[in-house]
């Protein structure tokens, strides 16, 4: 080091206010080690003078490998652009997973790109309008980088129209900042526009199984981009838990409301026939109820259309946006309710009910063992469900050897970095191997893995649930004279021991939806069915 410390103007590096410098090998450095480029700070020869002067030097090309530039956090407009670039990288990864792993149509990538372009144009418009409003009010301080702008639209409670007018600026700000949750909304809306049978529940399952990158998607962002993001933006890209059905639905409805109100985008309803067929298979119902469920669904839609056309303002934009909101929010729940009501019509949840009207002229009727259906469906879904996400220190003590091996495999896949094997020391891996290679121990371990043979065995048991049995001639005559009256599944004071109530609870639990919403949908479908029967009479 040449000479002593001397004082000068503040350092030219951003966020460094050091005024003390030293020289080393002819180069001037500040107290924090930042090299001063382009300006030479000279000290007076007379000691104690306390004066300094600046001399211009030939402009030197700045070294791009300087750590100060690479690690510098970007704020303002550049920070927004960098965050949107990081979000776009995650969208590209999810599109690749849809086309390569799941075999989706290649058009979905272009559809998501178009929706993202519309969203970007809308965010730019909202930012410019808010920027102009800030410039008009000179007394208002700039708050573009505050937490106020990072408000999630779905976390806001329902407000009155008057309060919405006062918070118009904050809503326009929130449009410019899509959280990671809205990536699933882009996928779902793109599938709606392409008429692909993707449900919110299936999207949630694909995210939980890491088939669609979500929980660790931020690790795929280049480091030179990620470390320059503001901390508030980083929080929006790192999720703390997997998204639930309700949160994905809220993000979808928010995105649809924005696109419909701004661009008058026509969002079609879900592809109900294909989704209905998939739901019947997933809950192991007989395929014979597909046609009754489809007819019942058409009856429900006709009742909704009759109720909608009675209003004079039905063709207005507000009414159309509300109708799209209602269709998307209740579509899957309405399909589940239609399947359950169709099963009640065809087979009945109570032994006193009419079994199946198509067996009136036959010597057979269908005897349904709903207790077996409940036990087998619950068993199959428990085997297919990954239970490690909610595991804690108490439940880990109940795992056997095979479950413990699967837990370590899951942990290694989810949390151990492939490019950094030093996360787990090599010595510990030798003492406690993740994959046990002891064949004699594995032979004695119970196999809880769901194989194809076990699935076939469970399906064979499910075939015994809906079994045609013979009836006597006298019972046949009484059965044919019986009046076709529909018995409601769930009365207003439901009994928890009732078979219909137990089946409804099971379906709501497996589909991860609220029980109250499913019960309300079932009662609405039943009212439409009774209205249709009354109109035919």
Curated annotation (Swiss-Prot):
PANTHER family: TATA BOX-BINDING PROTEIN-ASSOCIATED FACTOR RNA POLYMERASE I SUBUNIT B. A zinc finger (RRN7-type) spans 4-37. Zn(2+) binds at residues 11, 16, 30, 34. It comes from Schizosaccharomyces pombe (strain 972 / ATCC 24843) (Fission yeast). This is RNA polymerase I-specific transcription initiation factor rrn7. Coiled coil: none annotated. The keyword Nucleus applies. One of its GO terms (cellular component) is cytosol.
């Amino acid at each position: 080091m040449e000479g002593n410390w001397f004082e000068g103007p503040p350092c030219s590096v951003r966020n460094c206010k050091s005024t003390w410098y030293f020289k080393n090998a002819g180069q001037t450095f500040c107290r924090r080690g930042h090299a001063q480029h382009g300006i030479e700070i000279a000290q007076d020869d007379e000691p104690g003078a306390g004066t300094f002067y600046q001399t211009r030097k030939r402009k030197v090309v700045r070294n791009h490998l300087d750590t100060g530039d690479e690690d510098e956090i970007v704020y303002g407009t550049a920070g927004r652009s960098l965050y949107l670039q990081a979000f776009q990288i995650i969208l590209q990864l999810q599109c690749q997973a849809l086309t390569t792993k799941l075999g989706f149509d290649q058009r979905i990538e272009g559809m998501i790109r178009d929706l993202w372009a519309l969203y970007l144009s809308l965010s730019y418009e909202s930012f410019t309008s808010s920027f102009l409003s800030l410039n008009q009010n000179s007394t208002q301080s700039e708050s573009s980088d505050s937490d106020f702008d990072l408000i999630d639209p779905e976390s806001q409670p329902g407000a009155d129209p008057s309060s919405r007018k006062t918070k118009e600026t904050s809503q326009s700000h929130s449009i410019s900042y899509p959280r990671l949750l809205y990536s699933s909304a882009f996928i779902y809306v793109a599938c709606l526009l392409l008429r692909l049978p993707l449900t919110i529940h299936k999207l949630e399952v694909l995210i939980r199984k890491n088939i669609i990158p979500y929980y660790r998607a931020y690790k795929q962002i280049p480091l030179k981009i990620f470390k320059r993001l503001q901390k508030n933006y980083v929080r929006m890209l790192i999720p703390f838990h997997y998204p639930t059905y309700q949160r994905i639905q809220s993000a979808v409805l928010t995105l649809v409301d924005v696109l419909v109100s701004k661009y008058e985008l026509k969002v079609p309803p879900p592809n109900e026939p294909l989704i209905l067929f998939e739901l019947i298979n997933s809950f192991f119902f007989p395929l014979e109820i597909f046609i009754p469920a489809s007819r019942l669904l058409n009856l429900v839609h006709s009742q909704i259309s009759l109720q909608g056309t009675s209003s004079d303002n039905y063709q207005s934009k507000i009414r159309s946006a509300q109708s799209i909101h209602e269709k998307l929010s209740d579509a899957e729940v309405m399909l589940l309710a239609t399947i359950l009501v169709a099963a009640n019509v065809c087979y009945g949840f109570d032994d006193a009910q009419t079994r199946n009207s198509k067996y009136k002229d036959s010597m057979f009727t269908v005897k349904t063992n709903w207790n077996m259906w409940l036990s087998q469906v619950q068993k199959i879904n428990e085997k297919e469900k990954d239970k490690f996400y909610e595991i804690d220190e108490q439940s880990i003590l109940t795992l056997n050897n095979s479950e413990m091996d699967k837990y370590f495999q899951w942990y290694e896949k989810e949390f151990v970095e492939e490019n950094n094997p030093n996360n787990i020391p090599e010595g510990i891996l030798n003492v406690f191997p993740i994959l046990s290679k002891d064949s004699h121990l594995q032979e004695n371990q119970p196999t809880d893995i769901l194989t194809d043979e076990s699935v076939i065995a469970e399906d064979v048991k499910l075939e015994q649930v809906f079994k045609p049995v013979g009836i006597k001639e006298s019972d046949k005559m009484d059965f044919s004279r019986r009046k076709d009256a529909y018995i409601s599944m769930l009365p207003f004071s439901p009994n928890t021991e009732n078979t219909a109530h137990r089946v409804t609870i099971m379906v709501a639990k497996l589909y991860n939806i609220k029980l109250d919403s499913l019960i309300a949908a079932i009662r609405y479908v039943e009212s439409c069915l009774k209205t249709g029967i009354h109109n035919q009479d």
